[in-house]
Amino acid sequence: MKGNWSIVRKVLHRQFSTLRSSTPSSRLSTSIRPLVLAPNSISSLIARNSLFTASNIGPSIDFNFSNTSLPHRRSLCSEAGGENGVVLVKSEEEFINAMSKAQDGSLPSVFYFTAAWCGPCRFISPVIVELSKQYPDVTTYKVDIDEGGISNTISKLNITAVPTLHFFKGGSKKGEVVGADVTKLKNLMEQLYK
């Protein structure tokens, strides 16, 4: 998707490079109007103004610039949670219930404290999903520290950085990993839950 944006940006740059800052705004607006009114014409502009031909790009480019012919890459976005054995905690009540299960010993658990803006969290999130599949008897809770009512409760746990992972077994906290240390995370999971 990023590649398509760079192509569109180059085409638009070529299209409007002849315009100067002294050009009246009406000329600029009439130059842009066809793109705004007919966004699907962008693929024809790309075909005329680049090394690509219409047959190379074809119908795979549409207004949202999705191109399904590109190879899939590992996403750097934090997983949404809820699938793959990771439980997304959305409220203070859900967090308290999950923590109660972990502390009464009925459920071995991992609490993954994260934030949407956190780069290392996005890096380690696929590893956590993989480990939750590898250890299906361990419940992994994903907790966004910026989520509405959860922040007050989390502040009592002294979470000073994200990602932070707390590991519970037998009713008590057995370990903690702060940061995106994949080796330490995998070793601690194996040590506690194998």
Swiss-Prot record:
Domain Thioredoxin: residue ranges: 89-194
Q: Where is this site: Contributes to redox potential value?
A: G119, P120
- Residues annotated as carrying Phosphoserine in the record are S75
Q: Which domain of life is it from?
A: Eukaryota
Q: Which Pfam families match?
A: Thioredoxin
Q: Which cysteines are joined by disulfide bonds?
A: C118-C121
Q: Per the entry, what span does the transit peptide take up?
A: 1-42
Does the UniProt entry include the keyword Transport? yes
Alphabetical keyword list: Disulfide bond, Electron transport, Mitochondrion, Phosphoprotein, Redox-active center, Transit peptide, Transport
**Cellular location of this protein?**
Mitochondrion matrix
Q: Enumerate the active-site residues.
A: C118, C121
**GO CC annotations on file:** cytosol; endoplasmic reticulum; mitochondrial matrix; mitochondrion
Provide the family line: Belongs to the thioredoxin family. Plant O-type subfamily.
Physiological role: Thiol-disulfide oxidoreductase that may participate in various redox reactions. Possesses insulin disulfide bonds reducing activity. Reduced by thioredoxin reductases NTRA and NTRB.
- In Swiss-Prot or TrEMBL terms, this protein is called Thioredoxin O1, mitochondrial
Record organism? Arabidopsis thaliana
